[in-house]
């Protein structure tokens, strides 16, 4: 099987992203070289795994985190940095499928997720450039009217008072572009530097006694009353409980999860610091943006006045050679005034989606669990997911069961057939975007 941990990035190195230029990369933490026993073992030192470790420590549990590469190496340290509201489905769709009572649970958990992000930042004094405000930007009038309906529903039915509708004139004035027809501003959402955030969580976890091993790849798991994990170096871990939190990089450590979660790649560029007079209103407001395309554009400005712009996906294992130019073309459609701006950074990352885009919480066995598949909505949801896992282990909450009972169906066909099927499906939606 192709190893997604190594196919697109040099082994043991962070990608050369804008985010890595903003932090001081620490020395590699020790890899596991001896056999150990632990209460709880967590595979993956990303947002989910570190949130789980910190939440477990809060409840008096000890955990060990095994990271195949570097702390925050995957999507956790590469994403667009948006701390969004709600789930991947809007509330109307959740109500249609599950009824209002369950839709309310989804909403309350998502609201708690944002609060948990803010709480971790404040509690651990993580300097990650957090700022409030995310704009849902719509590419046509139909999407704009739909966004207004969503805003009304959230305000009236869920008492969410943080939304401000934007017409074409209003959104154009804020974003310094005529590309979008309207949308809304969500002041209850926000954005941050994800690598600073995840590294801050890692530092906090180590401070409270969590043992984190980097460059420690698990190659085999024997599930049972106790879990036996074997690493590529031959070290063995025996744990009472196990959490698989590798998301798009999990591979076949649990084939049932792998059949329900599809790794896909997404790409981001960052310009040179913008010249005086460019995007002045956008700089002043300092909001993040996600638009209404099926494969959305998402962007925001950095503290040093670069435009960080995400655009484009691919559905094969390897990043395409031209992804920088693909993302740049998408940026120029939104901001033609930046056609002569240099692109200083470009990077890709692998996230994980499910068929219905709801997160995949699974009971692998009586003592092993997996959480993955945030489908591009994971900065806040991964943090609450880790907390939910910790509460479940401590028998303080049934919310893990709430998510584990969601209908997350396997992708059709064996793994070798899923990629071409996914490509065909995504190409159809991409073509649909072009004619909207």
Language model feature labels by segment:
Residues 1-40:
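Extreme N-terminal leader/targeting segments of oxidoreductases
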Residues 36-65:
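N-terminal Rossmann-like FAD-binding beta1-loop-alpha1 element of flavoenzymes
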Residues 58-78:
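Glycine-rich FAD pyrophosphate-binding loop
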Residues 87-169:
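Dinucleotide-binding Rossmann-like beta1-alpha1 core, especially the glycine-rich loop
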Residues 107-111, 139-146, 185-204, 213, ...:
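Short beta-strand to alpha-helix junction loop
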Residues 115, 123-131, 218, 235-276, ...:
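Active-site substrate-recognition segment that forms the wall
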Residues 153, 178-240:
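Helical element adjacent to the flavin cofactor pocket in flavoenzyme catalytic cores
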Residues 317-319, 324-434:
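C-terminal catalytic lobe of FAD-dependent flavoproteins
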